[in-house]
Amino acid sequence: LQVDYLVLEVA
């Protein structure tokens, strides 16, 4: 999935 990087950005 490509949510890993998305979550890091939101964090």
Swiss-Prot record:
The biological process GO terms on file are: regulation of proteolysis
The UniProt entry lists the main location of this chain as secreted
Spell out the family assignment given in the record's similarity comment.
Belongs to the serpin family.
Q: How does it assemble?
A: Forms protease inhibiting heterodimer with TMPRSS7.
Give the protein's biological function. Answer: Serine protease inhibitor. The major targets of this inhibitor are plasmin and trypsin, but it also inactivates matriptase-3/TMPRSS7 and chymotrypsin.
Give the gene symbol: SERPINF2
Give the range the annotation lists for the signal sequence. Answer: none
Protein name per UniProt: Alpha-2-antiplasmin
- Where is it located? Secreted
Question: Which keywords belong to this entry?
Answer: Protease inhibitor, Secreted, Serine protease inhibitor
- What are the GO cellular component annotations? extracellular region
Secreted in keyword set:
yes
User: Which molecular function terms from Gene Ontology are attached?
Assistant: serine-type endopeptidase inhibitor activity
